[in-house]
Curated annotation (Swiss-Prot):
GO CC annotation: aleurone grain; vacuole
Coiled-coil regions, chain positions: none
Similarity annotation: Belongs to the 2S seed storage albumins family.
Assembly mode: Heterodimer of a small and a large chain linked by disulfide bonds.
Alphabetically ordered keywords of this record: Cleavage on pair of basic residues, Disulfide bond, Seed storage protein, Storage protein, Vacuole
Organism annotation: Matteuccia struthiopteris
Gene Ontology molecular functions: nutrient reservoir activity
Protein name: 2S seed storage albumin protein
Subcellular location: Vacuole, Aleurone grain
Length: 67
C-alpha cells in the first residue's frame, strides 16, 4: 500500500539505495520477491535498522543497484 511504500523508500534512502533502480533490476533478475520480503521485514521493524540496510545492500549489490 501507499504508506508502506513511502516508509520503504525513506528506509532505502537511509540505506543509500535507490528504490526504483533496485526494485526494477531485482525483479528483472527474479529477485523481486526476496527484495520485497526484505523490505517488509525492515518496515515491520522485525530487524534492527542496521541489519536491514546490510541485507538490502547485499541483495542490491547482487543486482548492482547501488545508489
Amino acid at each position: 500500500d501507499q504508506a508502506s511504500m513511502q516508509r520503504a523508500s525513506r528506509l532505502l534512502h537511509q540505506c543509500d539505495l535507490r528504490p526504483r533502480d533496485c526494485a526494477r533490476r531485482s525483479s528483472e533478475r527474479g529477485q523481486g520477491e526476496r527484495w520485497r520480503q526484505q523490505l517488509r521485514a525492515c518496515d515491520e521493524d522485525s530487524e534492527p535498522r542496521q541489519q536491514c540496510c546490510q541485507n538490502l545492500q547485499r541483495i542490491s549489490s547482487q543486482d548492482r543497484c547501488r545508489a
